[in-house]
Amino acid sequence: MVKAPAVVIKLDSITGLQSARILSGYGIPVIGIVDDPSHFCSRTNCCEEILAGSTTDDALLETLSDIAGRRGICALFPCSDESVRVLSRNRESLRERFRFVLPDEHVIDLFMNKINFYKFARDRGFAIPSTFFPARREDIDEIAGKMNPPYIVKPAEKTRRWIELFQKKVLKLGSIGELDRVFDACLDAAGDIIVQERIEGDDSRLYSCIFYYNSGCEQYITFTSRKLRQWRIEDGDACLAEECGDDEVLKQTIELIGSVKFRGLGSLEFKRDGTSGRYYMIEPNIGRPVTRIGLVEKAGVPILYAMYRDALGMSLPSDVMQRHTGVKWISIINDVLSAIAYYRKKQLTVREWLESLRGVKAFAVFSLRDPLPFIFQPFNYLRNYLGRPEPGPDERSHGGR
């Protein structure tokens, strides 16, 4: 029996690459859509086709229409927030020729917009960092009177303009004066912004629960893990992570997600305060895999395969329980960069770094069967570094990213 193809949208990302490899490993034909054909992840050999086209706007629909005309019914796997938004907006017209599992539009709005999410979590009694939603310059005075620096500033929703200007997902500001200096630029880049207190603790205090709720909105898979390091440090994506059991993370995730009618894939990140030990909800990711999706698969939990079968109306795999074997996952080059940064800050020794690599069994980019992405990764990074724009106002005051 011929299997329906899986279309990985935003293959040119570490998340997209891992998703394509995982699905291909189950014998599923994979088609990738990339914004950047020269990206190192676009060099993978695990796709039958790789098509160039926008994944961030409705131009994606033209590429999907071309695929459907040639390949018939396909299952869709968006691997970025922007592609989740495009599919959600056009879900009714797409359902004729594609199969996918996404939360309802109002649930996506609730979780993808951080202002909506933080208000929702706070109103239901969950702990979040002290948070402000400044819209006017006068609001800075209120922040100064109620919150001590450093301040974490982030957009309500990720925008291309924010990344172009600041070259990072969030800003860490050391004084109210710094916040005042970048305030207008932040509003211009994002529209709506969030200012939060920084929860004490290093990268290893960042925990998450990755979950899948089936098309009937029933809890089906949960998987808890934690970051050990991330790149960029303190505000980036995981580059070294490990499977771990954490009852509190699991409990709070189930309580929060259970309060809405949820279906599909998602994750919820927490930070455990280094002083009090209290868990704070940091952010959700919904409708798509996260960077460490390869860790879930290597630990024996077939979450993407379950999503594929669910989307196509097939029976779901039965063996989906987390085994808590302590598997570690690494993005090698990113972890080397992270380790160097921590070494320079005198927060990590070479010996400590080498010891932290024990137990690594899953790799984000490296693969003997699919070697080109790893080979081309450093060249892509060098190209991007040499082609970086002038730093934004925050970077001029902090020495760049």
Regions found by a protein language model. Give the residues of each.
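Peripheral (often C-terminal) accessory segments that flank ATP-dependent C-N-forming ligase machineries
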Residues: 309-401
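Phosphate-binding site of ATP-dependent enzymes
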Residues: 173-232, 243-254, 271-275, 279-280
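Gly/Ser/Thr-rich active-site loops/lids in small-molecule metabolic enzymes
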Residues: 176, 290-309
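Glycine-rich phosphate/pyrophosphate-binding beta-alpha loops
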Residues: 228-232, 236-240, 285-299
